[in-house]
């Protein structure tokens, strides 16, 4: 939920807890378990699950390779589930005109740099930059261009805004911060 007043604008950023991430983590987990079960079935020379026949698969080398693929897929799935659990990439963008500070906060993986916070002054902002990529997916990116020519991205590539919403959001932010907008 976004909060907006005359001097303060806080927008929430969605991280890894998206339906698509849960879907793909589940697909990878089920696929990995299927590979492991078929590999183990070929080792035992007996079908563990009836709809995954393994009688025609010899353990060496096919069953062994399937076990390795299953273990690799299981660890990839584990990584995806932990990223979802920790909500990596979520956070907020805070624009405070009263104090003259912009604060960008994101959650990372556990460890020394779990909390990622970038703060800079509003007076250091040169412009709001809107970069549009006109390809099949027609994605855009909103970023803050600082006076030292450094760009700080505000939106993620996977955000589901269409181009007109992206332009409107960039224009609102430029009006709020009272800086120009540049785009290409």
Curated annotation (Swiss-Prot):
Q: Name one Pfam family in it.
A: Ycf4
Q: Which InterPro entries match?
A: PSI_Ycf4_assembly
Q: Does the keyword Chloroplast apply?
A: yes
Q: Taking the first listed entry, what is the main subcellular location of this protein, grouped into a coarse class? A: plastid
Q: Alphabetically list the UniProt keywords.
A: Chloroplast, Membrane, Photosynthesis, Plastid, Thylakoid, Transmembrane, Transmembrane helix
Q: Which residues cross the membrane?
A: 22-42, 64-84
Name a GO CC annotation attached to this entry. chloroplast thylakoid membrane
Describe its membrane topology.
Multi-pass membrane protein
Homology family: Belongs to the Ycf4 family.
Q: Which HAMAP family match?
A: Ycf4 (MF_00437)
What is the stated purpose of this protein?
Answer: Seems to be required for the assembly of the photosystem I complex.
Q: Would you tell me the protein name for this molecule?
A: Photosystem I assembly protein Ycf4
Q: Organism, per UniProt?
A: Staurastrum punctulatum
